[in-house]
Amino acid sequence: MNWITNYVRPKINSMLGRREVPENLWIKCPETGEMVFHRDLEENKWVIPQSGFHMKMPAKARLKDLFDGGIYEAFPQPKVAQDPLKFRDSKKYSDRLRDSRTKTELEDTIVAGLGQVQGIKLVAVAHEFNFIGGSLGIAAGEAIVKAFERAIAEKCPLVMFPASGGARMQEGILSLMQLPRTTVAVNMLKEAGLPYIVVLTNPTTGGVTASYAMLGDVHLAEPGAEIGFAGKRVIEQTLREKLPEGFQTSEYLMEHGMVDMVVKRHDIPETLARVLNILMKKPAKAIKRDTATELAPLPVAASA
């Protein structure tokens, strides 16, 4: 009976055994609990079809979706010092970098490129949140500065898509130094007379909010994005007060004058083109008019 127990039974078990299902095959909506097949979610620009909830979008996918035909020149990642402080908390920083690179297939959190959006040449920069929370470190800071320099050289606008928890703590003061560096880069672009547009995504917090994320000429934001410096829980524990409903969301910030427009992800390319045409003083015929959203004429008051 050995041949049955040693060969036949394991063979049958392997044939009838449970097949392994790949991870993240189905994505759950954090708002409604709706389950969405990952390919359907990707085709819908990482927006839940029924609820309209905007999931975090991979940086490469964001640039591909933004540029005309998905075609753009990807900028190389600048070479910088790796783990200069030899930092370690519960895990070595070098190990965190290695794991994030394996997970995202990126060298660091910034993805940048040059292309066209509805015929307008521009440089776009996006954070990859899955790379150590999209945190700002030496490599990210250098990539952002290089992107601004390229925009100035090309004499074209720059569009920023921040998605970050803030400065990268594993790099200490070297990370904090990227705040003034990126701020100087923003000023250089503005001195060159070129537009700088920021599209705030979920989440935009910490040192990124305290620097280049809030220095745009125009600030757009995706629906429901968390935008702020310190987290809501930290503020409540410090002030010992309950914060208003919707505090630090893009809609709340627009109501209080911190954001110019809340724009759905599907409408971002067209909205950017319209805004840039205005900022770059293009002829009126170059601006696509949306008659469905035009304001109705004001009523004329009746004469006394």
Swiss-Prot record:
GO terms for biological process: fatty acid biosynthetic process; malonyl-CoA biosynthetic process. It is found in: Cytoplasm. Keywords: ATP-binding, Cytoplasm, Fatty acid biosynthesis, Fatty acid metabolism, Lipid biosynthesis, Lipid metabolism, Nucleotide-binding, Transferase. Pfam families: Carboxyl_trans. PROSITE patterns: COA_CT_NTER (PS50980). Pathway: Lipid metabolism; malonyl-CoA biosynthesis; malonyl-CoA from acetyl-CoA: step 1/1. It catalyses: N(6)-carboxybiotinyl-L-lysyl-[protein] + acetyl-CoA = N(6)-biotinyl-L-lysyl-[protein] + malonyl-CoA. GO terms for cellular component: acetate CoA-transferase complex. It comes from the Bacteria. Its EC number is 2.1.3.15. One of its GO terms (molecular function) is ATP binding. InterPro entries: AcCoA_carboxyl_beta, Acetyl_CoA_COase_Trfase_b_su, ClpP/crotonase-like_dom_sf, COA_CT_N. It is an enzyme of class 2 (transferase). Residues 25-294 form the CoA carboxyltransferase N-terminal domain. PANTHER family: ACETYL-COENZYME A CARBOXYLASE CARBOXYL TRANSFERASE SUBUNIT BETA, CHLOROPLASTIC. Component of the acetyl coenzyme A carboxylase (ACC) complex. Biotin carboxylase (BC) catalyzes the carboxylation of biotin on its carrier protein (BCCP) and then the CO(2) group is transferred by the transcarboxylase to acetyl-CoA to form malonyl-CoA. Acetyl-CoA carboxylase is a heterohexamer composed of biotin carboxyl carrier protein (AccB), biotin carboxylase (AccC) and two subunits each of ACCase subunit alpha (AccA) and ACCase subunit beta (AccD). Belongs to the AccD/PCCB family. This is Acetyl-coenzyme A carboxylase carboxyl transferase subunit beta. It comes from Sinorhizobium medicae (strain WSM419).
